[in-house]
Amino acid sequence: LAATALLAAVKRRGGEVRDGVTALKLRSGGVETCEGFLHCDAVVNACGPWAGAFSEAAGAPIAVLPRRGMLLVTAPLPYAVRHKVYDADYVGAVASGDADLQTSTVVESTRAGTVLIGSSRQRVGFDDTIRVAVLRAMAQKAIRLFPMLAQVPVMRAYGGFRPYAPDHLPVIGEDPRVPGLWHATGHEGAGIGLAAATGQLLADLYLGRPPVVDPYPFRVDRPAVLKREGDGS
């Protein structure tokens, strides 16, 4: 719903949405897409977990990688989980830079009565295979917090990729290496919640207005993010 609302706001302000169009590379005065050249003064790399790949194609690589996560959704049940609950391991997993699998408990109910059970983190490129062993580990940890979940059937499971930056901060701002290229990525699991504020900050910077927050921690040319020629990180 949040993404739908943001998209509607873009359209109300004159924005155009082109479904199924892939940006291939930057050229002077715009961007080359699978449907031809698109003229523009600025290109925003908001490609999420694919932001690192696009930055390579744009000639300004940044260290943003996909970090896979999975989630379980239970069948609807009477209102039992009244607040979002997570264990202490969750904070450590979010802040970790380890590429290996990490699971930590997050349990949250929805208005429809289903319960969301997470979470996992693992850097495996874009391998989107759903791993039963990972789902089982998440379920077992959730049952320790809420034993009644042991009797609740799982309705579905799904996974996705978070855009991971090595220092765990978003990448927001103009790229100093390529004029007209801007980045808005690296939020990992907080992207949808920070989307509106990120757009506001990016607009402030582009238009030369006083920024809504200090942009310095999110700058593109910080050591953890900027990849230079010959850098294999």
Which residues does each PLM region occupy?
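Active-site substrate-recognition segment that forms the wall
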Residues: 47-176
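General beta-strand structural signal in soluble alpha/beta enzymes
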Residues: 17-19, 45, 64, 183
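General beta-strand recognition
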Residues: 30-32, 115-116, 171, 182-183
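Short hydrophobic core segments
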Residues: 38-50, 54, 199
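Helix-loop-beta segment of a Rossmann-like dinucleotide-binding subdomain
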Residues: 1-13, 120-124, 179, 185-187
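C-terminal catalytic lobe of FAD-dependent flavoproteins
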Residues: 127-233
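Short acidic/polar mixed-charge low-complexity motifs
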Residues: 34-37, 113, 190
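Helical element adjacent to the flavin cofactor pocket in flavoenzyme catalytic cores
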Residues: 1-41
